[in-house]
Amino acid sequence: MALATERAGFKQIAVEDFRITEEPYYLPISDEVQLFETAYRENVPVLLKGPTGAGKTRFVEYMSWRLHNRDGIGHAEGVPLITVACHEDLTASDLVGRYLLEGDETRWIDGPISRAVKNGAICYLDEIVEARKDTTVLIHPLTDYRRLLPLEKRGELLEAADGFLLVMSYNPGYQSALKDLKHSTRQRFIAIEFDYPPREQEAQIIAKESGVDPAIANELAKLAEKVRNLKEHGLGEGVSTRLLVYAGKLIHDGITPRRACQVSIVWALTDDQEVQRSIEEVVSSIFE
C-alpha cells in the first residue's frame, strides 16, 4: 500500500534497475537505428550531435528498449539505461563515486557511470560539453579496447560488463571556445548527426505525440519550417519538434491554435519583442 504522502503513479527505483519496458515512439529519419545497433554489438561508443528537441534523448530511450531480449510471450525487458544530465559543476566523483561518512565509518557509494559499468547498462551523458573538461577525461579508458573505469580513490579498476555502452550528446549550436569537446575525447566515438525532420515526418510525429488532427499537425510542421528560417534574423535557435508537440497538445485540448503557438513557441523561443512579433506574423499567416 502506498504511503499517504505518495501520489499515484510515483515510483522509486535504483538507477541501474531502470529499463524502458514499453516501446517509446520514435520515427527513424535515416539509418541511425542500424548504426546504433552495430555500434552496440561492436562496443563502439556513440556521440549524438544535434539541436535542442531534435529527438536525441528519445532515440536513446528507443534504442534502450529495442536492444532487449523477449521472452516467450513477447514481453520486452530493455537494456538498463542510466542518464546523467551534465552541468558545469559535475565532478569526476559525481560520475564515478565517493566516500560518505556514516556515523564513525565511511562507506563507498558508486556513481552513475560505475553502476552502468557493473550492470552492463547504456550510460547516457546528456549535453556533455556542459561538464568540466577534466571530468570527461576519466571516460577515456572506457572508450577504447580496454573498457576500463579507474577508481583512483579505491585503487581499483572496473572492467565493463557485457552490454555496457557509453553514449554522449551535445548541441553543436552551443559550442564556444570554452565549451567544446577535446579532440582526444571526440576521436573516441562515432558521431550520429540529428536535425529537425522533414515536414511530412515532423507532421507525423506531432500528430502521434499530441493526438492533434493530422491537418493541424501539418500546419504546425509548416510553421516550424518558416520559424527556423528566422535564425538568420535574430532568433537564437529554431523551434524544436518538442515545442510543436506541446502546441499540438494544447490545441487538442481546446486551446485556439494561435494562442497555443503563442505560449508554446513565440514566448518560449525568445524574449526579444521584435523577434516575437516576427514569429507571431508567421503564426498569423498560417492560423488565421
Question: Model segments located where?
Answer:
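C-terminal engagement/docking regions of AAA+ P-loop ATPases
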Residues: 257-288
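A short, ordered amphipathic alpha-helix with a cationic face
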Residues: 192-195, 234, 253, 270
